Regions:
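Histidine-anchored nucleotide/phosphate-binding helix
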Residues: 1-7
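Short, functionally important structural connectors and interaction interfaces within domains
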Residues: 8, 35-38, 174
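A short beta-strand-loop structural module common to alpha/beta enzyme folds
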Residues: 9-22
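Glycine-rich beta-alpha loop elements in corrinoid/cobalamin-binding modules
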Residues: 19-165
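N-terminal [4Fe-4S]-dependent radical SAM core
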Residues: 156, 160-201
Length: 201
């Protein structure tokens, strides 16, 4: 995804990682927001903040990173102004089982993102150019196969996901069907610094 998005001229995809507790404490003490690795851009200044959820133990890191970024944890507390806060998105292998994160996410991406993420980025670009509200963007995004908006669904007495509006699609997992045309990373993402750049005693 990093390569796919950065090969486009209209998108900059940058990385950010959950800092250790000591670094998190220092960020809080000095009033410094969590920022991207490549350009040191504050997360609150980005248009979309997406998490790769690899397993359930990542759930608390998501909230930790939102808090360090100064972004309201709950999606309902971010208001309807698309330009005030980044769109908060979760994807990755464990997103299909990430319902505990539903109150905190604007969108969840279920399945393979190689086609889905660029489609969502196109929609975000269009929404910002045309001045959409956050709620309109979320409602439009669920028409992209694989995109699930927790705020537009509820659970019935049996725990089955139920749409709040009759015309909403049923969320499903997106799969890249044509591997012959699928993107393949030509350059691996590597760290900026050497891991073993210190003396071990």
């Amino acid at each position: 995804l990093y390569t796919i998005l950065n090969n486009r001229e209209d998108i900059f995809a940058e990385r950010v990682y959950a800092p250790c507790r000591e670094t998190g404490r220092l960020l809080r003490e000095h009033g410094v927001s969590l920022a991207t690795l490549e350009s040191d851009t504050d997360i609150v200044k980005t248009h979309m903040f997406a998490f790769a959820i690899t397993h359930e133990l990542c759930f608390t890191n998501v909230l930790y990173m939102l808090e360090l970024s100064g972004i309201p944890l709950r999606a309902a507390d971010r208001g309807d102004d698309l330009f005030r806060w980044p769109l908060i998105v979760a994807g990755g292998g464990c997103a299909i089982a990430s319902e505990p994160l539903a109150p905190f996410m604007d969108l969840m991406l279920l399945g393979e993102g190689e086609e889905m993420v660029p489609e969502l980025c196109d929609l975000v670009i269009k929404a910002r150019e045309e001045g959409w509200s956050r709620s309109r963007l979320i409602e439009e995004a669920v028409n992209i196969p694989g995109v699930y908006a927790p705020s537009l669904y509820t659970h019935d007495a049996n725990g089955v996901l139920t749409p709040l509006k009759p015309d909403l699609p049923t969320p499903g997992r997106r799969i890249v069907a044509d591997f012959d045309r699928a993107a393949y990373p030509e350059k691996q993402v590597v760290p900026f610094g050497a891991v073993h750049n210190r003396l071990s005693l």
